[in-house]
Regions:
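Alpha-helical scaffolding segments of alpha/beta enzyme cores, especially the outer helices
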Residues: 77-80, 104-111, 150, 154
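N-terminal metal-binding scaffold of metallo-dependent hydrolase/deaminase domains
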Residues: 1-39
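Conserved phosphate-binding/catalytic loop of the ribokinase/pfkB sugar-kinase fold
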Residues: 132-157
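Divalent metal-dependent hydrolysis catalytic cores, especially in the metallo-beta-lactamase
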Residues: 59-63, 76-105, 119-132, 159-173
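Short acidic, glycine/serine/threonine-rich loops at helix termini
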Residues: 102-104, 134-141, 177-178
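Conserved small/polar residues in nucleotide/adenosyl-binding loops
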Residues: 180-182
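Short amphipathic alpha-helices and their capping/turn segments at secondary-structure boundaries
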Residues: 39-46, 105-118
């Protein structure tokens, strides 16, 4: 769904580094592409506009872990929880688990994002299982292993573009990283 082009007049805009006063934000396809003072109308201005927060590592919310309940209902709970608490965008995360759990999570993410294109879900963060067992942190050792080229290609294929991040230990990857195309 293509977002409409819009213009917003803003008394106080925080751009992430500094506060700008009395500006006009021009938005195209859902993105701010121009900020200027030309044409500012105080009668149409919002008092304050700030960027939204983004949570890049979310295992679950409201008593639903994605690894335990890899379904649309869990993602709806995550989305609702984050919006109620001031975070618009979120990245559901699956830690080191068997591929079956990762695949079910991917399927839920694909379905949720396709059914809710305006949601705050930005894709799945696959955190493991391709870690160095000596540096596993809180990950379950039984699920940590070195990936094969086949395993990498399979998870990428199943993702259909819905993996937004993969956390791995580069020293355990024996496959040419140029083969990975998300």
């Amino acid at each position: 769904m293509k977002k409409k082009d819009k213009t917003y007049h803003v008394k106080n805009f925080y751009d992430g580094d500094k506060k700008l006063e009395k500006v006009v934000l021009e938005v195209k396809n859902g993105f701010i592409y121009k900020i200027s003072r030309k044409g500012y109308l105080s009668s149409q201005a919002f008092d304050i506009v700030v960027p939204t927060f983004v949570d890049l590592q979310v295992y679950g919310s409201n008593q639903s872990l994605l690894s335990e309940y890899p379904n649309i209902k869990t993602l709806e709970k995550m989305d609702s929880f984050h919006k109620k608490n001031g975070t618009y965008f979120f990245q559901p995360t699956i830690a080191s688990y068997p591929y079956e759990v990762i695949y079910k999570s991917l399927e839920a993410i694909k379905n949720y994002m396709n059914q809710n294109p305006e949601s705050g879900c930005i894709g799945l963060h696959v955190e493991g299982p391709w870690f160095n067992p000596n540096k596993k942190g809180a990950h379950i050792i039984d699920y940590i292993h070195r990936p094969s080229e086949k395993a990498i290609n399979e998870i990428i294929e199943k993702s259909k573009g819905k993996i937004s991040m993969i956390t791995l230990a580069p020293e355990v990857i024996k496959v040419e990283l140029s083969l990975i195309h998300i």
